[in-house]
């Protein structure tokens, strides 16, 4: 069995954090239930036996920490709600377990928290840093919008994508907070959203929400150099669509990107030791607004959550040779599901 969690919005019928079990033999979800009712748990991450979730209470915003029990049940450790500048959209724990990073889309903020490595508690908000760069010309680029904040594979920096300014910003981090180190500029109206790094850490795949493209980049000492780019939606599609999540298969051979609007998952083969991509196919996701997905440790299944429509959880069996996906199950429902954590 694979144990997983789905974070959700709680604006409509979403309950917070869902817990599920996937049968690894059949590819079917055998149990999906509310794991913990908490407001606005739009992104989740974990570090060993601790789970962290974005949350808020009224105007107070921040993150919550949980202990993961043997059966997958969640027990609240504490909350750190030290800001009134808006809820986050992405969180990750540093590789040494000392820090938690949070991206805040609406206010264009990067937050860094101090963690207790033994208890899993969030001790304090170290810094809340506002991006102040010139914006792009797209109608959604009215201000800075930080969408991703995660450690680089060399463990030297934390990197932020800024959808509002078409920039990827690299910071040094530590007890004193964040210190800007490098800025990588992308095309006007790209809207960089998320990043997936190659297994060797030498290349990064940066997905752009507004242009619906993925940039293949060379990563070196905090800087990103674009090598090529590809569209994630068909050239003859004229509807509205905006790219969402990106994940690399664990074997590093295939890249997957979800499209909201076109409601699909684009599949690419990774070539030339990570320097190039080749489009394989674009697979329907079987519901509306596939905001996030994840791939099981075995590489055999891809689990996709949908924010809109019926909020189905689509389970795809993955061909480990071709990278192609085939639908196995779509009966489970996770209302307003927007993050899949395994």
Curated annotation (Swiss-Prot):
It holds the Pfam family Lactonase. InterPro entries: Cycloisomerase_2 (IPR050282), Haem_d1_sf (IPR011048), Lactonase_7-beta_prop (IPR019405), WD40/YVTN_repeat-like_dom_sf (IPR015943). GO terms for cellular component: cytosol. GO terms for molecular function: 6-phosphogluconolactonase activity. Gene3D superfamilies: YVTN repeat-like/Quinoprotein amine dehydrogenase (2.130.10.10). Belongs to the cycloisomerase 2 family. This is Uncharacterized protein SERP1457.
């Amino acid at each position: 069995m694979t144990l997983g969690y789905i974070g959700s919005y709680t604006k409509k019928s979403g309950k917070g954090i869902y817990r599920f079990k996937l049968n690894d033999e059949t590819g079917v979800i055998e149990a999906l239930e509310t794991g913990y009712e908490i407001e606005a748990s739009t992104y989740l991450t974990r570090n060993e036996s601790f789970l962290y979730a974005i949350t808020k209470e009224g105007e107070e915003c921040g993150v919550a920490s949980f202990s993961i029990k043997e059966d997958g049940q969640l027990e609240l450790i504490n909350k750190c709600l030290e800001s009134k500048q808006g809820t986050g959209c992405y969180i990750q724990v540093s590789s040494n377990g000392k820090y938690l990073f949070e991206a805040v889309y609406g206010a264009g903020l990067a937050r860094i928290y101090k963690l207790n490595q033994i208890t899993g508690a969030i001790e304090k908000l170290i810094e809340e840093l506002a991006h102040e760069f010139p914006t792009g010309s797209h109608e959604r680029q009215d201000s800075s919008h930080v969408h991703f904040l995660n450690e680089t594979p060399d463990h030297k920096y934390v990197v932020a994508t800024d959808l509002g300014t078409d920039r990827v910003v690299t910071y040094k981090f530590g007890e004193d907070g964040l210190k800007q180190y490098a800025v990588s500029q992308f095309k006007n109206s790209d809207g960089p959203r998320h990043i997936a790094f190659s297994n060797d850490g030498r290349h990064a795949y940066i997905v752009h929400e507004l242009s619906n493209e993925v940039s293949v980049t060379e990563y070196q000492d905090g800087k990103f150099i674009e090598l090529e780019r590809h569209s994630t939606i068909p050239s003859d599609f004229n509807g509205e669509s905006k790219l969402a999540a990106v994940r690399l298969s664990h074997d590093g051979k295939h890249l997957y990107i979800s499209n909201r609007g076109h409601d699909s998952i684009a599949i690419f083969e990774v070539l030339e030791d990570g320097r190039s991509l080749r489009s394989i196919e674009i697979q329907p996701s079987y519901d509306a607004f596939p905001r996030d997905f994840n791939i099981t440790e075995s590489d055999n299944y891809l689990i996709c959550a949908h924010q809109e429509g019926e909020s189905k959880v689509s389970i795809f069996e993955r061909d480990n040779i071709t990278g192609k996906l085939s639908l196995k199950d779509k009966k489970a429902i996770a209302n307003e599901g927007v993050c899949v954590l395994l």
